[in-house]
Amino acid sequence: MSVPIDRINTVDTLANTLESNLKFFPEKIHFNIRGKLIVIDRVELPILPTTVLALLFPNGFHLLLKHEGGDVSSCFKCHKIDPSICKWILDTYLPLFKKSNNAYPSKIAFNPISNTTLVLFLTECCNIYLFSENKKPVDQKIRSDLLEQTFKNNDVFESADKKKIRKGLSDGPLVDALQHCGFRYNDKWAKRVKEPKLMSLMSYIITTVESSSLSEEFLSKILKLWGQPGNKCWWINEVIKVNGSLINVWRRKQWLLEVTIMGNRENSQD
């Protein structure tokens, strides 16, 4: 059983006022992410997805104005994101924008639809809940095995209606957006990490699409996700039998799709 919820967010995000304060931040910002030291240049902050900024700065940027995080002794402690994911984003997502002189929102041409490249950043959070028929706690090995089984199923559209996707039929607004931007029904997640203590998985994939390949009508819709991620949430239920006992398994999946404009190609050649 799958119960979908589709929503497009309209609430302002952390990035809205970021650039205006950037020059007052430390040049190098230090993070202690689950015991791993990661350093991010302040000029890279406006390029990062707002969903990532929200994890790195859950309380906003005001401490940066006090030069917190400027060295190792005052580094920000962050537990909401895995360090391997953060490094992957820095190594994979940022280089896409560094190729363009117009990577920053303030440098994008007035008409962002013309000759631009869109970057789509899709995140999935999958939380797993187990309920045994005898109402006793589920054995840790069973929990670990089920988490590993879910981890190995690396399909982006694992719980979507693939028959609809193959035929180009609708399976919800965000799935439609992904299809229009080149995602295929057999795509795999580019990066995944298990969170055993939380009994959850985090999955990520990044892709790009040229604006010239999309209709203006569709562009006007997908640009609503620029800095304001779209959200799709649904539950999947199944009953499994382990060692003669029935276990009710509920998986809560949440997608966040964020679109960023890389910049106007014509202007980036100046």
Curated annotation (Swiss-Prot):
Intracellular or extracellular location(s): Cytoplasm
GO biological process: mRNA cis splicing, via spliceosome
Sorted UniProt keywords: Cytoplasm
A GO term, aspect molecular function: RNA binding
Gene Ontology CC annotation, any one: catalytic step 2 spliceosome
Source organism, top-level taxon: Eukaryota
Name of the protein described by the UniProt record: Uncharacterized protein C20H4.08
